[in-house]
Each structure stands twice: as C-alpha cells, then as structure tokens.
Amino acid sequence: MEVSRKKIYNPNSTESVNERKIFGGNPTSMFDLNKIKYQWADHLWKTMLANTWFAEEVSMNDDKRDYLKLSAEEKIGYDRALAQLIFMDSLQANNLIDNINPFITSPEINLCLVRQAYEEALHSHAYAVMVESISANTEEIYDMWRNDMQLKSKNDYIAQVYMELAKNPTEENILKALFANQILEGIYFYSGFSYFYTLARSGKMLGSAQMIRFIQRDEVTHLILFQNMINALRNERADLFTPQLINEVIGMFKKAVEIEALWGDYITQGKILGLTSSLIEQYIQFLADSRLSKVGIAKVYGVQHPIKWVESFSSFNEQRSNFFEARVSNYAKGSVSFDDF
C-alpha cells in the first residue's frame, strides 16, 4: 500500500493525541507539544538538546603533527575511514529531510528527526574541520565516496533502500528504511568510529578521536530514535511484521555485516595494531546482534564483544581521567544510554 506524504497545512484534521501514528496518520502539522503520545520522543528530544556541542570546542592543534608521523598504512586508513563517515552523514542529512520525515505523522517524532538532520549537518562540519586541520588530501578525501570503487560499492548498497523508498513509498518500504537507518546508525557508523579509537589508544590523533566521541554520542540518540519507532510500529501495525519481512530484514543485516567486514579489512589492510580481520568481523557481528535484539529479532551470530575497550573510549557517562588530556573531565551532561528509553 502506497503512503502519502503528510500535509504541511491541514486545518480540517480532527486527529486526537491518542489517534496519532508513526506514519499514515492525519496530523494538523501544528507542533502542540503540550500533548504528547510518544513520551520517549519527548525525552529523546530533550536529551538531544542537552547534547549540543560545536566542532570548534575540540582542539585539533596536535593532530596535524600526529598525522605527519602516521605510517603510510595508518594515513590510508584514516583517510578512508573519514571519507566513509563524510558520505554517510551527507546521505543521512538529505535522507531524513527529503525521504523519511515527510511520511512520519507524529509531531514529537518530527521534531527529533529535524534535530537529527541538524546533527548530521553538524557532523559534516566537524569532518571538514578534521580534514582541513590535518590532511593534505582534502579534495581526494571528499571525492573518495565515488572515486574509490570499494567505497562506492558499499555506498551503492547503503543508498539502495532509501532510493527504493523515494521511488515507491509503500508501508513496507518505509519500515525497511527504518531498519536500514538502524543499520546505518548502529553498524556502519560504529565500525568507522572504532578505527579512530584504535589510533587514539596508541596516543595518536587524539583530537580526531575526541571529535568522533561527540559524534558518536549523537549517533546513540539517532539509533534509539529509529529503534523506538520500529518498536512502536510493532504495536500499531503488527500486520507489517510478517515472517517474509523479518527474513528480509535479517538478510539486510547479514549483507551489512559482510560488506562492513570487507570494508574494515580494506581500511586496516591487515597492518593496524589491535584490529585484526577476525576482531573486525566479530565486532561487526556483535553490533548486528545487539541492534536486532533491541527490536525483538533473534540474534544471528551469538558472539561476545571482542573489543570492549572501545566502550571506555566512547563513554560520556562517567567522570574519569580524559584520555585526550591529563585532566579530569565530567561528561555527564546529556549522557544517554539504551536503558534510558
């Protein structure tokens, strides 16, 4: 069944708060935020606001020097990992505004999606700061998304589901796009972040890793947003969650794991200390299992987290000695975890 985009002006709507739907509703398009159906969205909105940050807060002064000292393999990995993130945030900013939000008919969720789009744009600015601060290959990095065939092949697959929704906006394609967002936010991004943390663990590119920490904190809320939309739809539209669709979703996750494991090998070239091929693959499998279980789908791989130290590098939830500087920093403001929702 094809779904229409919501009206931007709809004074004849009589839809009550309890009648609101994730998609397929009939909203007035007024943001009456004194009436909330999806309380988790209101909580998430406030958390996203509390997490506000700016790229200029992060010092990149030492990264230019560090970059020059990286091995050839480390530089290649840095450039490739950064090029991947640049593409994904660019795609996601456009996808949210043009492709997802027009079909979502809950105003409190619309607000979260608009905020997420802003954060994706902020991340694009952060990457520009990183590129301009440390790399002599500015144009090369920004063109890599279509000139590097390994990356382009991956990007073609990532964009496929979103392009299908744009061409054929059915209920099933909207739902599959929500799952695709979960894969993007919860597997592809997380895998990319781990490379920067690996360098930082060796005392290299600490400003870049700090920037990634801020970005990852945002991505946690993005992942939770789509996770909760999917779970809310299970209650509203259980008829959409057919065995056939669930099998398709599992297939999407398996393909994502396969693609990301190959990409991880391509980034590291088997020459980055702390990131072997088996560790990369197991980490990606662990991420896939975690994302599936959060939306009521059985785990596929049954593996343990193989690089738990990554969590300590990305955590904002405790006061501890900052690994970037010899001082104690409190990052409690805006802290968020899956347990909060």
UniProtKB/Swiss-Prot annotation:
The keyword Mitochondrion does not apply. The gene is nrdB. Provides the precursors necessary for DNA synthesis. Catalyzes the biosynthesis of deoxyribonucleotides from the corresponding ribonucleotides. Signal peptide: none annotated. Its cofactor is Fe cation. It comes from Helicobacter pylori (strain ATCC 700392 / 26695). This is Ribonucleoside-diphosphate reductase subunit beta. Binds 2 iron ions per subunit. The active site is at 127.
